[in-house]
C-alpha cells in the first residue's frame, strides 16, 4: 500500500501469527488529517473492540462503516450469519454500519459466475440488515465487469479491485515468509 502512496499505520504484531489487539500511538494521527482515513477492523468483533476505543474521536465526525461480506467466508455463508456477525461488530465497536460491500471471492479461484451469483446473497443480507449495497467488487486481474454482466443484469455498481494482500503461503520467498523479515 505504501508503494501507491497510502500511509499505513499498523500494530506491532501485524503480519504475524499473533492476534493481539495492540494499537500504536501513531494511530491517533489518523483522526487529525484533513483527508480520508480508512480503518480495517477485521471481520469480527475482536478487531471491532479495538476500534471501539476510538469512539470519542469518531462519533462527532462524518463517517461510513462499510460491512464487507464474502459469501465464501466461513461464519457468514448465509444471510443470518452475516447479520449476527454485523451485530457483534457494531456492539463491540459502538458504531453502526452504513453500507454493505459485496466482496465475495476465492482469490485466484474466483470467476465471473461466482461474482454474479453472490449478488443474490448480498441482496438478502441488504434486506435483512436494512443497509444499501454500495458495490460488488471483482478482481480486475482476472475479469472485467462485462464478464460478470454476461450472466445477467446487475443493478449495483461493479467495482474493480487490485489485490495487494497475500496469504502466508503466497508470500514465501527463498524459503522464508516475507512477514518474518519485517
Enumerate the predicted regions with their spans.
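N-terminal phosphate/diphosphate-binding loop that engages ATP/GTP or pyrophosphate donors
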Residues: 1-19, 26, 152
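Short, conserved active-site loop motifs that form the nucleotide-linked donor/cofactor pocket
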Residues: 6, 63, 158
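Switch II (G3) loop of P-loop NTPases
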Residues: 10-16, 35-51
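Short, acidic/turn-prone active-site loops that include or flank metal/cofactor-
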Residues: 13-15, 71-72, 164-165
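Glycine-rich phosphate-binding loop signature in dinucleotide/nucleotide-binding domains
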Residues: 30-37, 61
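Conserved catalytic-core segment of NTP-binding enzymes
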Residues: 45-153
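NTP-binding/hydrolysis catalytic cores, primarily Walker-type P-loop NTPases
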Residues: 130-139, 143-182
Amino acid at each position: 500500500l505504501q508503494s501507491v502512496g497510502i500511509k499505513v499505520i499498523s500494530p506491532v504484531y501485524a503480519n504475524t501469527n499473533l492476534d493481539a489487539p495492540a494499537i500504536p500511538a501513531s494511530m491517533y494521527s489518523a483522526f487529525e488529517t484533513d483527508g480520508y482515513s480508512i480503518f480495517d477492523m477485521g471481520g469480527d468483533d475482536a478487531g471491532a473492540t479495538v476500534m471501539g476505543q476510538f469512539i470519542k474521536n469518531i462519533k462527532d465526525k462524518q463517517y461510513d462503516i462499510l460491512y464487507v461480506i464474502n459469501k465464501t467466508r466461513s461464519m457468514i455463508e448465509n444471510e443470518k450469519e452475516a447479520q449476527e456477525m454485523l451485530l457483534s461488530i457494531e456492539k463491540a465497536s459502538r458504531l453502526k454500519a452504513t453500507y454493505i460491500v459485496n466482496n465475495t471471492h476465492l482469490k485466484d479461484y474466483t470467476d465471473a459466475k461466482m461474482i454474479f451469483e453472490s449478488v443474490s446473497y448480498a441482496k438478502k443480507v441488504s434486506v435483512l440488515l436494512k443497509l444499501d449495497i454500495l458495490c460488488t467488487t471483482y478482481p480486475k486481474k482476472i475479469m472485467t465487469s462485462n464478464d460478470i454482466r454476461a450472466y445477467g443484469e446487475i443493478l449495483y455498481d461493479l467495482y474493480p479491485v487490485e489485490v495487494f494482500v497475500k496469504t502466508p503461503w503466497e508470500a514465501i520467498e527463498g524459503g522464508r515468509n516475507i512477514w518474518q523479515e519485517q
